């Protein structure tokens, strides 16, 4: 079996330290967490920016500070920045990309209802429309390719996978664009084994894909992804808890658990250099 590529989502935007006290906020904390993730086996770090108080940030200077802190500690790791937000213009969502030129960036492949719902209180904590029209997709992928940024196509439902087809037909989608099968978000496809297998079948043959599972079901579905010759993402953005049920104290612990799981299935973990070769991603900045 080919080596497995581990990604680590370090912080996210929808949670805070009242949910998990170990979520990194500041550029220095993100740099330190990136190092812990890399030491445990991650080749890719996916990062949202935050202000020092933990609120989501889209200020370019914050991304630049994060970039410097991560590169200082992890000179060769593949940096992947978020571009997703509700209520912001597409220009606000991607203005940090030309300034920082990360190796990869999240490329959200379709519009959807998006929210966090509590069954206990029977209400939404927040919700909105995550808007990504085809015009938006065309604009974003052009900015990414102009800046040598590999698009990480985040697909929250089956139709999002198909949305790549016209972009590829127009010659806009780089050959090394990757598929992320995101599951468990309210408004997107539920996180079940059957749904993951269905999503995998929709991905064009020969394409790189990984599972992203937003819940404690992450470990069950990550095992399926690994067994089906795919890859998976872990980290405090997606799931605070280790397979034992204990809350993780760092992203490094999440990655270590993921590496152990992969090796139990017979998959060795790809190094950063091997990941760059497999995905055809040269060091961008």
For each feature predicted by the language model, list its residue ranges.
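Alpha-helix-loop-beta-strand connector modules within alpha/beta enzyme cores
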Residues: 8, 56-81, 137-140, 144, ...
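Active-site mouth loops of central-metabolism enzymes
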Residues: 10-32, 82-90, 126-131, 152, ...
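Active-site beta->alpha loop and helix N-cap motifs at the rims of alpha/beta catalytic domains
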Residues: 57-58, 63-131
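Structured C-terminal cap/extension of enzyme domains
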Residues: 197-202, 220-285
């Amino acid at each position: 079996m080919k080596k497995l590529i581990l990604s680590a989502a370090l912080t996210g935007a929808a949670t805070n330290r009242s949910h998990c006290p170990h979520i990194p906020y500041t550029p220095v904390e993100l740099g330190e967490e990136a190092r812990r993730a890399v030491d445990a086996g991650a080749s890719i770090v996916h990062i949202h920016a935050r202000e020092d108080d933990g609120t989501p940030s889209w200020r370019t200077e914050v991304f630049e500070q994060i970039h410097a802190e991560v590169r200082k500690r992890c000179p060769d790791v593949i940096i992947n920045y978020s571009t997703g937000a509700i209520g912001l213009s597409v220009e606000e969502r991607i203005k940090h990309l030309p300034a920082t030129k990360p190796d990869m960036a999240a490329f959200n492949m379709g519009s959807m209802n998006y929210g966090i719902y509590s069954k206990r209180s029977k209400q939404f904590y927040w919700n909105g429309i995550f808007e990504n029209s085809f015009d938006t997709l065309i604009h974003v992928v052009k900015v990414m390719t102009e800046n040598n940024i590999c698009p990480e196509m985040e697909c929250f439902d089956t139709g999002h996978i198909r949305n790549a087809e016209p972009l590829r037909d127009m010659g806009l989608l780089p050959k090394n664009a990757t598929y992320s099968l995101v599951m468990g978000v309210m408004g997107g496809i539920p996180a079940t084994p059957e749904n993951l297998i269905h999503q995998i079948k929709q991905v064009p043959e020969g394409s790189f894909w990984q599972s992203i599972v937003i819940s404690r079901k992450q470990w069950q579905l990550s095992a399926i992804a690994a067994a089906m010759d795919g890859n998976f993402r872990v980290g405090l953005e997606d799931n605070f808890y280790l397979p034992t049920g204990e809350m993780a104290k760092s992203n490094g612990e999440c990655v270590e658990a993921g590496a152990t799981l992969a090796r139990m299935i017979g998959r060795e973990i790809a190094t950063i250099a091997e990941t760059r070769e497999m995905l055809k991603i040269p060091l961008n900045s």
